[in-house]
Design a protein with these regions (language model features):
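Nucleotide-state-sensitive switch-loop elements of NTP-binding domains
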Residues: 2-12, 16-17, 21-118
Length: 118
């Protein structure tokens, strides 16, 4: 398992376009989260917020990333080591360059999907 890729799902879009709600619906879907650990990187805060107890029920750890300069390979690798996720979901800040995130991916992180809400 140590060498298996970790799928990364990136949600991007305008502020208040429904990213958080959409992610919550996906996490609540048993076909998506069955017995797997998810790390949710939160790169922006809108009106809709996550309840950490609710997330824990679905095997999800919330990790805030408060600025684009915190997207470094070292920081993301430490997150991977700390949480040992089966998958990573990123609620990305639409004002940040997507390239910043992609260039910071540790070796095992593999982009599976980019979802844009409007």
């Amino acid at each position: 398992m140590a060498n298996n890729p970790i799928p990364v799902y990136v949600f991007t879009g305008f502020l208040e376009s429904g990213k958080t709600k959409f992610i919550q619906e996906i996490l609540a879907d048993p076909n998506f989260t069955e017995n797997e650990v998810t790390t949710l990187l939160l790169c922006e805060e809108g009106i809709e917020e996550y309840d950490e107890k609710w997330l824990a029920h679905y095997g999800t750890a919330l990790v805030p990333i408060e600025s684009e300069d915190r997207l470094t390979p070292n920081i993301l690798k430490r997150i991977e080591q700390k949480y040992n996720p089966d998958r990573i979901i990123v609620e990305y800040n639409g004002m940040w360059k997507l390239e910043s995130l992609m260039q910071a991916f540790p070796a095992r992180w593999e982009l599976y999907q980019i979802i844009t809400t409007v």
